[in-house]
Amino acid sequence: MEIIEADEQHIPAMQKIYAYHVLHGTASFETQPPDEGEMSARLKKIQEAGLLWLVVLHEGEVKGYCYLGRYRERFAYRHTLEDSIYIDPGFQKRGAGKALLRRAIDWAESHGYRQLIGNVGDSEN
């Protein structure tokens, strides 16, 4: 496995992974999967905010992704981020999510963030 920063070339694979989780789980809190254009806009928003979006690659293919977004916009939450992790259903239970989370935690700590919040919305995790 290789973990790298996400870019536009990863959008189609990330959209496919996310669409699966929207349609077959409850963790995303969305009911309709966003299209590639919306996924691209989300990636751009995270990157323009100076935050982190990673993909995990296996044999050159995107098998999951993780990003850190602002938890709340209020000033008191300025050191708090929320993590989101989505793994290809055929690649789960291989440590990809754990590896992404470790990298996200390390990045957050090195950038002065003090809290990382993850909401788990699916009891089958």
Predicted feature descriptions by range:
Residues 15, 19-43:
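Conserved GNAT-fold acetyl-CoA-binding loop/helix
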Residues 2, 28, 82-86, 117-119:
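Short aromatic/hydrophobic contact patches that present stacked aromatics
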Residues 33-90, 101-102:
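Acetyl-CoA-dependent GNAT
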